UniProtKB/Swiss-Prot annotation:
Designated gene of the protein: petE
UniProt binding sites for Cu cation: H73, C123, H126, M131
UniProt name for this protein: Plastocyanin
Subcellular localization(s) per the UniProt record: Cellular thylakoid membrane
Keyword Transferase carried by entry: no
The organism's taxonomic lineage, starting at the top: Bacteria, Bacillati, Cyanobacteriota, Cyanophyceae, Nostocales
Cofactor(s) needed for function: Cu(2+)
Length: 139
């Protein structure tokens, strides 16, 4: 009888240990981390462009806009050219203040509930020269 009780105790401890290990993986598995991407304002060759001009991200990701060449630059998201057609969303993503010096940066974090689709943006001083870009938020 003692032998059976001891065997059951060992079996119970083994099962409990396995359950504890398995459940700790479920609790401590990190969720998908948001990423940060960099978009240069002005090319390395001094062209009035965003580099890259097109970028694909996920909701919750951050885009850093780095003033590179030929300042001043800013980043304005077009209210009519975003999936939500929302002026408030475009305003919250935009940075209208001009970055005057190379190396200055500003960043935008896309909300976790940002609708999937294309978000068009431009540099106000250089829009006429073709300084426009597009960020695609993937679902």
């Amino acid at each position: 009888m003692k032998l059976i009780a001891a065997s059951l105790r060992r079996l119970s401890l083994a099962v409990l240990t396995v359950l504890l290990v398995v459940s700790s993986f479920a609790v401590f598995t990190p969720s998908a981390a948001a990423e940060t991407y960099t978009v240069k304002l002005g090319s390395d060759k001094g062209l009035l462009v965003f580099e890259p001009a097109k970028l694909t991200i996920k909701p919750g990701d951050t885009v850093e806009f780095l003033n590179n060449k030929v300042p001043p630059h800013n980043v304005v998201f077009d209210a009519t050219l975003n999936p939500a057609k929302s002026a408030d969303l475009a305003k919250s993503l935009s940075h209208k203040q001009l970055l005057m010096s190379p190396g200055q940066s500003t960043s935008t974090t896309f909300p976790a509930d940002a609708p999937a689709g294309d978000y068009s943006f431009y540099c106000e001083p250089h829009r006429g020269a073709g300084m426009v870009g597009k960020i695609t938020v993937a679902s």
